[in-house]
Amino acid sequence: MVKCFDFFLSLNFGKMTKLLVWRTDKPQDDMPQTPNSQVTIVSRDHPRGGNY
């Protein structure tokens, strides 16, 4: 449960930060990092819950 919540918070924070700073600074450099960890977490929690 904590991992899911942390993941959700990270996603929300990442979106906000991207819109505020990284979007204008360097979106290409930030983009690969966020989806990378996102894919890893989703892949790990996929068997437990396909919804996430």
Curated annotation (Swiss-Prot):
Reported impact of P47A: No effect on alkalinization activity
Expression induction or repression: Up-regulated by the GmPep914 peptide, ethephon, methyl jasmonate and methyl salicylate.
Domain of life, source organism: Eukaryota
Biased composition (Basic and acidic residues): 43-52
Record note on what altering D45A does: No effect on alkalinization activity
UniProt note on tissues of expression: Expressed in roots. Barely detected in flowers.
Polar residues: bias regions: 31-41
GO BP terms: defense response
The keyword Hydrolase is assigned to this record: no
Keywords: Plant defense
Region (Disordered) residue spans: 25-52
Stated name of the protein: Protein PROPEP914
